Amino acid sequence: MAFSVSLLSWAVTEYQTEISAANQLGHIRSAIRWGAEYLLRAHTSSTTLYTQVGDANRDHQCWERPEDMDTPRTLYKITSSSPGSEVAAEAAAALAAASIVFKVADSKYSDRLLRHSKLLFEFADKFRGSYQGSCPFYCSYSGYQDELLWAAAWLYKASGDNSYLNYAASNDGWSQAVSEFSWDNKFAGAQTLLAKEFLKGKTNLAKYKTGADSFVCALMPGSSSLQIKTTPGGLLYIRDSSNLQYVTSSSMILLIYSKILISAGVRGVQCGSKDFSITTIKEILE
């Protein structure tokens, strides 16, 4: 849920003019506010975040209207003694990104979102621990470092506070080459946001630019470091299960990173001996 709020907000920060031209800005703001409000209400103290309602295994065995549900409404939460840095940091990222969306439209609400985001990030970082509350159903397989970097990048973008960039720079050893961007693995998103800052002159973020390039190379047919296959029709084939969610999120990264490179005057991405132009990168999405 928090990841969805993050991506909807990212779409607005990058494509507000286009969304507005399609008369969808009000709708997407309403969706973001709905999700953000839920996260705000779930954040009941500086070190308490309610993370889930219900037993996922039981719920998935019975598809029905919420009004008819009689499965257990078990509550899960994270605290300082039972941490879950992944979910706290992702909630921080979501609220920071949403605060940008409402900065002009509703400045008081934007400030509130940012305050909670900072508290959640501090909670996630100070009480580091992997979220195991409802495993084996909703587990973190990538660890919590990706969410901490992702949240720090959004907090910098929302606040302009250089301490968040310094956090990312001092923890660049966490950054990994990946071929997936998903609700569980945020490295490619963090790398894309931080690569933009590198291209604007923040040279201590060079590893994130390398990571963002690596993500492109992992997806591009003909790349020497290709990791993702395509279907006969050209669709990225990342996972056997629920593939389109990974295709959609990967496509978003490729589009936004292409936009970032164009703005920085960079013509493409070098993958081994082969150079992929911005046009070629975008063609994989057609």
Model-derived segments and their meaning:
Residues 1-2, 6-286:
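Glycan-recognition and catalytic cores of secretory/periplasmic carbohydrate-active enzymes
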